């Protein structure tokens, strides 16, 4: 179980700086009202500041908050006065106001102490949430909060934490342009999962493997529960953020052992992945490592799209977390539509992924092909048959897959696209054989680009994205090369050789065992 989950009815683990506090008495005593600081009090507070922190760095609101907290939690007041802000759970600074009166001062106002000021080297990492508040406070929406909680409605930084008075951390408003949470509406919608009829031996083997390995609803629910729990944790640092499940867990091509991809969205605008995203992920990596007992082996990987990899001890699932890589949200629903538009697509793609994984072709971190690239290659093959099995959805339904569509519409737009009725009735076994043959001897790797967007092979241009690349697979939305990880001639030759070997073996034997020990894989998967 997740120790901080409110659904479990448990009090979260106390923070290191917390002390057990007696419960607040439900009496008729007068609520504590903020009192202005007397000169001698202010002097006493200032004397507690370290030499490296100038008194003007603390705003009047912080002094008011400290004076109130002094009556309720001595340890917390001492922590604030000693400027030990790293121990304070990060909370985005809200506007300050007294009930119905106008705000005293706004953190965004020119007079705010932290505005337009670089952090000095001797200040350490003081209040990084304030420094990074541009990621947390949307410009189009203003949320009013009660700045000084009274005794009857003291806020807590962590749900259920006992007697730890802080500024109330509000429920974050939904950012404009974001898709709904995966657990809210569409995640468990019924989709047509009718399988094709298999008459030959090879097609039956493919279907049997698919039915044993495909992701189950229970697997998806476990991942989504962890996503929801992590979203609550991350919103303690970035209150305006939303966390989305993307990739194979949602696009229909996942297996029971598939990793789960998460996209943390902080703002609508594109984010610099080299600077902003890395900074945010470094904060989250530290938070996961030090605060979350159910997160195991968090790793911060500084790739082109940086991620934090970790394992959830509760579900046993592996997760990859990125920040603001919103193209992943768009292509998740594009691929999901392809997955269910024709009933041969999912079984074929799954067996291709299992074959590639078994032979070491499915690991972008080791210079081979990512799962996403393999899916695009399979879809491209089905589009380029003399009688296509699937069309280009972006050409046939451009209004549903517009790259400029607001994110909150992305999941809804393709839901009413009907099944594609192809005249091509080729069985699964022949489609698998044709896929291997196409990339073994027919596709021109040196001259062509694989394009699902155009449903054909495009001639290579001299653009930097395609120049001197061994394999070129176009991302349907941002049109980058999803196969850029294959940058070594040795790895490219290995991939081509395996396609050729697999095609010859399957052509001669017409048995899935010639590609991989599929029954052993099924047995191993069922034991998980």
Swiss-Prot record:
Could you tell me what this protein is called?
Answer: Poly(A) RNA polymerase GLD2
Q: In this protein, which residues make up the domain named PAP-associated?
A: 428-481
Single GO BP term: oogenesis
Q: Which family does it belong to?
A: Belongs to the DNA polymerase type-B-like family. GLD2 subfamily.
| Residues covered by region (Disordered) | 1-41, 99-121
What are the annotated GO cellular component locations? cytoplasm
Quaternary structure annotation from Swiss-Prot or TrEMBL: Component of a complex at least composed of cpeb1, cpsf1, tent2/gld2, pabpc1/ePAB, parn and sympk. Following oocyte maturation, parn is expelled from the complex. Interacts with rbm9 and sympk.
A GO MF term? metal ion binding
The function of this protein is: Cytoplasmic poly(A) RNA polymerase that adds successive AMP monomers to the 3'-end of specific RNAs, forming a poly(A) tail. In contrast to the canonical nuclear poly(A) RNA polymerase, it only adds poly(A) to selected cytoplasmic mRNAs during oocyte maturation. Plays a central role during oocyte maturation by mediating polyadenylation of dormant mRNAs, which contain 5'AAUAAA-3' sequence in their 3'-UTR. In immature oocytes, polyadenylation of poly(A) tails is counteracted by the ribonuclease parn.
* Gene3D superfamilies, sorted: 1.10.1410.10, Beta Polymerase, domain 2
């Amino acid at each position: 179980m997740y120790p901080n989950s409110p659904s479990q009815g448990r009090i979260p683990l106390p923070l290191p700086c917390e002390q057990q506090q007696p419960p607040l008495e439900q009496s008729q005593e007068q609520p504590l009202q903020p009192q202005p600081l007397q000169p001698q009090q202010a002097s006493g507070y200032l004397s507690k500041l370290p030499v490296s922190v100038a008194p003007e760095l603390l705003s009047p609101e912080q002094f008011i908050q400290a004076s109130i907290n002094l009556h309720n939690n001595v340890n917390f007041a001492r922590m604030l006065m000693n400027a030990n802000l790293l121990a304070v759970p990060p909370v985005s600074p809200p506007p300050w106001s007294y009930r119905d009166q106008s705000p005293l001062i706004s953190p965004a106002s020119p007079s705010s102490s932290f505005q337009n000021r670089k952090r000095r080297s001797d200040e350490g990492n003081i209040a990084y949430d304030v420094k990074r508040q541009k990621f947390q406070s949307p410009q189009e929406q203003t949320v009013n909060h009660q700045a000084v909680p009274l005794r009857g409605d003291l806020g807590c930084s962590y749900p259920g934490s006992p007697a730890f008075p802080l500024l109330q951390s509000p429920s974050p408003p939904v950012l404009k342009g974001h898709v709904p949470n995966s657990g809210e509406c569409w995640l468990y919608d019924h989709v047509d999962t009718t399988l094709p009829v298999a008459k030959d031996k090879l097609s039956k083997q493919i279907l049997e493997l698919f039915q044993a390995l495909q992701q189950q609803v229970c697997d998806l629910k476990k991942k989504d529960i962890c996503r929801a729990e992590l979203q609550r944790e991350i919103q303690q640092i970035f209150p305006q953020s939303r966390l989305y499940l993307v990739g194979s867990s949602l696009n229909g091509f996942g297996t029971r052992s598939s990793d789960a991809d998460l996209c943390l969205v902080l703002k609508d605008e594109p984010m610099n992945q080299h600077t902003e995203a890395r900074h945010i992920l470094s904060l989250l990596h530290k938070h996961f490592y030090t605060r979350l007992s159910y997160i195991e082996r968090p790793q911060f990987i500084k790739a082109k799209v940086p991620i934090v990899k970790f394992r959830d001890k509760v579900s046993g699932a592996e997760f990859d977390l990125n920040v603001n890589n919103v193209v992943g949200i768009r292509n998740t629903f594009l691929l999901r539509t392809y997955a269910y538009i024709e009933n041969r697509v999912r079984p074929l793609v799954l067996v291709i992924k299992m074959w590639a994984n078994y032979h070491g072709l499915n690991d972008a971190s080791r210079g081979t092909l990512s799962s996403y690239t393999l899916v695009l290659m399979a879809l491209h093959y089905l589009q380029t048959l003399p009688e296509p099995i699937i069309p280009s959805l972006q050409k046939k339904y451009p209004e549903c897959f517009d790259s400029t569509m607001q994110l909150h519409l992305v999941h809804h737009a393709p839901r009413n696209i009907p099944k594609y009725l192809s005249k091509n009735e080729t069985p699964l076994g022949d489609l698998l054989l044709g896929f291997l043959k196409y990339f073994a001897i027919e596709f021109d790797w040196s001259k062509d680009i694989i394009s699902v967007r155009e449903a054909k092979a495009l001639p290579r241009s001299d653009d930097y994205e395609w120049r001197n690349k061994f394999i070129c697979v176009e991302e349907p939305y941002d049109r980058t090369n999803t196969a850029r990880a294959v940058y070594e001639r040795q790895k490219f030759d290995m991939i081509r050789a395996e396609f050729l070997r697999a095609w010859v073996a399957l052509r001669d034997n017409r048995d899935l065992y010639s590609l991989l020990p599929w029954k052993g894989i099924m047995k191993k998967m069922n034991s998980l």
